[in-house]
Swiss-Prot record:
Originating gene: SFTPC
Natural source organism: Macaca mulatta
Predominant subcellular localization, coarse grouping: secreted
Domain of life: Eukaryota
Pfam families named in the record: BRICHOS, SP_C-Propep
Other comments on record: Pulmonary surfactant consists of 90% lipid and 10% protein. There are 4 surfactant-associated proteins: 2 collagenous, carbohydrate-binding glycoproteins (SP-A and SP-D) and 2 small hydrophobic proteins (SP-B and SP-C).
Lipid anchor positions (S-palmitoyl cysteine): 28-29
Protein name: Surfactant protein C
Location in the cell: Secreted, Extracellular space, Surface film
Length: 191
């Protein structure tokens, strides 16, 4: 055996892979484009993971809410209890900015509006299918205020207490607790 043949055996085997060892290579792309492509892929993967986690959390929250509602209302005795105490959740009170207070009484189908100075109170009867929004109520009150005022005694005689009339103090029982609390001490006007 000669010395030259030993050297041939000590050499490393040839590399048949497409990319050099230890380097990820994309053929025919400059280095800065390769780095940009890697950054874009990493950012997209991070966004996909975050959106997936948020959607899973939203799904779990929705399922939990549905389960709690089903447990609280689903039982027959719970439905009977809600039917018996239905009058407890029939009013909604909204602060109308600094201009006043609005009370919706869904059981009696009454809406009461008291302006902030508190000198009068407007009461409106509604139908169950056409309960006005706060904006519609504001327009109606503003239209009522823009009309010329007719003395209430004339209204009581002619129209039998129609729009714009003021009731006597004995009529407050039909208004309910929330509306009579809001409007108990000031003159009432029916719109």
């Amino acid at each position: 055996m000669d010395v030259g043949s030993k050297e041939v055996l000590m050499e490393s085997p040839p590399d048949y892979s497409a990319a050099p060892r230890g380097r990820f290579g994309i053929p025919c792309c400059p280095v800065h484009l390769k780095r940009l492509l890697i950054v874009v892929v990493v950012v997209v993967l991070v966004v996909v993971v975050i959106v997936g986690a948020l959607l899973m959390g939203l799904h779990m929250s929705q399922k939990h809410t549905e389960m709690v509602l089903e447990m609280s209302i689903g039982a027959p005795e719970a439905q009977q209890h809600l039917a018996r105490s239905g009058h407890l959740v029939t009013t909604a009170t909204f602060s109308f900015g600094s201009t006043g207070l609005v009370v919706y009484d869904y059981q009696r189908l009454l809406i009461a509006y008291k302006p902030a100075p508190g000198t009068w109170c407007y009461i409106m009867k509604t139908a169950p299918e056409s309960i006005p929004s706060l904006e519609a109520l504001t327009r109606k009150v503003q239209n009522f205020q823009a009309k010329p005022a007719v003395p209430t005694s004339k209204l009581d005689q002619v129209e039998g207490r129609d729009a714009g009339s003021a009731p006597s103090r004995g009529d407050l029982a039909f208004l309910g607790m929330a509306v009579s609390t809001l409007c108990g001490e000031v003159p009432l006007y029916y719109i």
